[in-house]
Amino acid sequence: MILELDCGNSFIKWRVIQAVDATIVGGGIVDSDQALVAEVGTLASLRLSGCRIVSVRSEEETAALCTLIGQAFSVVPRVAEPAREMAGVRNGYEDFQRLGMDRWLAALGAFHLAKGACLVIDLGTAAKADFIGADGEHLGGYICPGMPLMRSQLRTHTRRIRYDDASAERALTSLAPGRSTVEAVERGCVLMLQGFARTQLEQARSLWGEAFTVFLTGGDAPLVREAAPQARVVPDLVFVGLAMACPLN
């Protein structure tokens, strides 16, 4: 079995797969290293043969997690590293090491699945878009605040905006103009995300016409499904690229 980890700024997404055929044994999202070890340890018949990690954390934080994983499960984690070129994709950043590893691996995974030009829209803490040409050239992308950041900024800097997560969820049953603060904030943020997605689609069409594949990934991908009905929703797109960057079989 292989433990795969996607370590973001706020959460760790994890899954355990069979080494032979990549069948998913279990998975989840946690908010701390300790919670990760506890959750993975509850899997029945757990026998890890390896671990691979993609991380946007600092080197020190990533190293600490690798040590913890090694102590808990007796495996040596492999951490994905930036590359100028891999699996037919050429990193488009002027300094290739500065491209976030989550974006790089999502680009690898998307190009592998699309076998041609593709647009990746990743909606998590940040909203990100990346363009990969039919020849594998990464053309660059965009980053802006995602739903969690927009929401937290409004809550933090506007004293009268206070509501809980349950209220936020109820507010998203419609996108009609809000008749309460929670509805106005939540629906406004969703419309901004949808506008972001539509703009990326326009950009992609200006580059490739209709000859491209759209991928939606990240926890808030369902919120923009309406804006990109032709998109393929691939929640584990980063893990597709991670397996390519860190083969363990």
Curated annotation (Swiss-Prot):
Its cofactor is NH4(+); K(+). CDD domains: ASKHA_NBD_PanK-III. Substrate binds at Y93, G100, M101, D102, R103, T181. GO terms for biological process: coenzyme A biosynthetic process. Keywords: ATP-binding, Coenzyme A biosynthesis, Cytoplasm, Kinase, Metal-binding, Nucleotide-binding, Potassium, Transferase. GO terms for cellular component: cytoplasm. InterPro entries: ATPase_NBD, Type_III_PanK. The keyword Nucleotide-binding applies. ATP binds at D6, C7, G8, N9, S10, F11, I12, K13, T125. The gene is coaX. This is Type III pantothenate kinase. Homodimer. The keyword Kinase applies. It is found in: Cytoplasm.
